[in-house]
Each structure stands twice: as C-alpha cells, then as structure tokens.
Amino acid sequence: MIKKRNTTKISVIGAGSVGATTAYALMLSGVATEIVLVDVNKSKTEGEAMDLSHGADFVKPVNILSGDYKDTEGSDIVVITAGAAQKVGETRLQLINKNINIFKSIIPEVVKYNKDAILLVVSNPVDVLSYVTYKLSGFPKERVIGSGTVLDTSRLKHEIGKRYKIDPRNVNTYIMGEHGDSEIATWSVTNIQNIKIDEYANKENLEYNDNFRKEVYENVKNAAYEVINRKGATFYAIALAVTRIVKAILGDEKTILPVSTLVENYYGIKDVYLGMPCIVGGSGIEKALSIDLNKTEASKLVKSAETLKNTLNNASGL
C-alpha cells in the first residue's frame, strides 16, 4: 500500500515518445511532486526534463529531473516505457526478443533502488514484458502491473460512442486478453449506462449486428497500426491511459480498469499476464475480476492466452 505522505515520486524509465509524453501527462494531472526521467540517451532526457520544467508556472508544483537509476530511489511508482520501437508492419509480439534483453538490464536496476514501488509496464508487447518484469523483479504480482487493454478499451468505447452519437464514458465494456492482435471485445457484457447494447440499439433504432461488431472490433484491433502508418508511433492516448492507472493507484480509488495482471485460474488460463478487469488501488492490483463471458468470447480469450504463452516459450533469453 502506498503510504500517505506530502510528496509523491514517479519515475519514468524510457524518455522516447511514450515516456516523455507520459511525463507530460503526469505533470498536467498534478498527481506527483517529483518526476524522474531515465534513458540511455542522456542528452535527450535532459532536454525533455528541461522542456517540461519550463512549464512550471502553469501546473501544480512539481520537480522534474533527468538522472540515473539511483535518482529513482524511493519512487512510489516506476513507469517502464523503455524498449525497441514498434516498426511499420511489425506486430507487438515480434518485439519480444529485443525487449527482453533490454528489460534484463533495466529491471534489476529499478528493483535495486525501489524495493517497495509499484511497477507499471507500458513497453510492448506489454503482457509478455509484464510477465518478464514479474519474474525478474521477484515482486508480488499485485505490484507488477501492465497497462494492458486500458487503451484498447478506450478505443472500443470511442468507436461505439462515435457511431451511436453518445459520450464514450457512458459505454461500459472491456477489451480483454492480449494488448494486440488476439485481443477480444466482450460484447456479451457491453452496455450503455446499464442498458444492454442490443436492447439500447433496438430502442434507439441503431445498428447492432455481426457486421457492426466485426467492423468496430477490427477498427479497435488495428487502431495502433493505422496511427503508426500515418505518424510513426502512438503516444498521446497511451500516456493518458498510464496517467489514469497512476491516479487510481495514488488515490487508492479501487476503480476497475482492464490492466494486465497475472492470471492464475480463469477459464483454465494460468501463469500468464493478460488484460483483465481489475480493482486498482493503493496496493496496485487488489483483485482480478472473473467476469462471465459467453462461450465464443471465453474460447477466444483462451486462444489469446495460448498465443502469449507460446511467445514466452519461444522467446530467447527466458
């Protein structure tokens, strides 16, 4: 449990597009009194910290600095965004071997100075690297969290909200499983302010059929690729997703977010990190919720878990 105190320290490992934008989003949110950026590119990291610090007059008091792992000591949360960038046409799972080796150098250093911190993994493939972090750190599963499908779920809500012309925040649904190509949309539990989506669509004379579900799902699943094809990387939305998770932890909100967690017995799935609805609070992941899926969704989730397990089994250096 993160103890109540006057200062809150967050360290961000990796000062690339995602890391720097995450630091910016955290700065704007006002959740931290100190943000530390660490990256192998010292000059760029110093520049990012300087640039952010120059906005001090426009936000709550916050000390932003660049440094080494020693400077992260005593962090409440360590956000890990470091890793090889996803290239055009490259799936998240193809990144694994490159990023495992990077994590082998990062995690021991993070743990050395932050034995009580919560680790929030953002680097892709996030589910696999969350599992790798869990194993390398020796931390309890509650304190090793992946950003999971929080962003994918936001994309799904956005797609439905756009088509139905309603506030996406009124759409209750989840993307579960891998943050990537085998993720699943939980249509069976999707509702609009507690009205089942099929009932809502019927009452409002809106489209809701196999074609609708397929089109929406494909748009969500391929969203990152579409952004990467146009601008080279995704970083704004994921930075907001990370900030949302951080706020849930620091505020001990006990809110439900589909983060990546160690699944131990859910539809027969064991010993793998997957995006699951979890209660997130001051202790990190306080509980993973075993929501009831229909047979098709459950089968797809099992396959998603198998995909990730196969990747782990085939990865070099594990």
UniProtKB/Swiss-Prot annotation:
Q: Where is the active site?
A: H179
User: Which reaction(s) are listed as its catalytic activity?
Assistant: (S)-lactate + NAD(+) = pyruvate + NADH + H(+)
Localization per record? Cytoplasm
Q: What Gene3D superfamilies does this protein's entry cite?
A: Lactate dehydrogenase/glycoside hydrolase, family 4, C-terminal (3.90.110.10), NAD(P)-binding Rossmann-like Domain (3.40.50.720)
Task: Identify the residues that bind NAD(+).
Answer: V18, D39, K44, Y69, G83, A84, S105, V122, S123, N124, S147
Q: Return one GO MF term.
A: L-lactate dehydrogenase activity
Q: How does this chain assemble?
A: Homotetramer.
Q: Which family would the database say this protein is a member of?
A: Belongs to the LDH/MDH superfamily. LDH family.
Write down what this protein is called: L-lactate dehydrogenase
Organism phylogeny:
Bacteria, Bacillati, Bacillota, Clostridia, Eubacteriales
Q: Which gene encodes it?
A: ldh
